Amino acid sequence: MALADYSYQPGRGIYTDMNALRPDDDVDPIHSVYVDQWDWEKAIRPEDRTLDYLKKTVTEIYSAMKRTAFLLGELYPELEDYLPENITFIHSEDLEAEYPDLDPVEREKRAAKKYGAIFIIGIGYPLSNGKPHGMRAPDYDDWSTENHNGCHGLNGDIIVWDRVRNDSLELSSMGIRVDAEALVRQLDMKGAEERKELYWHKRLLRGDYPETIGGGIGQSRLCMFLLNKAHIGEVQASVWSEEDREEARSKGVYLI
């Protein structure tokens, strides 16, 4: 909406250094009450609503992460850069076909460990069992547009293999946003047709907004990954219970 109201042209956009508190969320080594991320949104042309454009944007973001990891390794040799040179793109539907007996979380782990860095495409579209790889709102990313080989979605997550935690780590969620056609389709799929009467939705449906792409990059998660930390509380100040602190201390981890 802001891109429309401030007349942003294709190729231009906005970003925010977002800080938020989520006191009702569960906390663990990669989730805290305090949330910090770079949220960004860019106006694009209608002809940019393609899988190739999405991949190009993902590659640019990943390249910035890779360069940062390399430079840190040059300055501090103990911070080994083990990110692969290129990110691997995988459709959530292809991932299900490759690992049909695993749940989505385990599929992510298996693929992230195999490739080092992956972008899972089409998160939100129902897989063969009728359930999506992960939940997505119907009025945000376009996860339903068919792209190739019968697969769907113009969105996804950047996920890396974290050697310190021996686990996968999501660093960014992003995608090409819904246009009018995708919005109507996804609201119907989710049984949320009544949202068409909301202010934002009405404006999109009547063509007030430019086509856009956007996402969020987790600041603390990226920092803990680049600095080889095992807990998000090692790179940001947040609120932790004494039980959480004691558990971390027992593993040689001291929370800020």
Residue ranges and their predicted role:
Residues 1-31, 39-43:
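Class II aminoacyl-tRNA synthetase-like tRNA-binding/catalytic domains
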Residues 12-14, 35-39, 115-117, 157:
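Extracellular structured ligand-interaction cores
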Residues 22-23, 47, 125-126:
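Short, solvent-exposed loop/turn segments at secondary-structure junctions
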Residues 28-33, 107-109:
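Short, flexible, solvent-exposed loop/turn segments with mixed acidic/basic and small polar residues
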Residues 44-52:
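Inter-helical turn/loop segments and adjacent helix faces that build the functional surface
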Residues 52-69:
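Long, well-ordered alpha-helical scaffolding segments within enzyme catalytic domains
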Residues 66-104:
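Alpha-helical scaffold segments that mediate packing/assembly in large oligomeric complexes
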Residues 92-256:
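A translation/RNA-centric and nucleic-acid-associated enzymatic feature enriched
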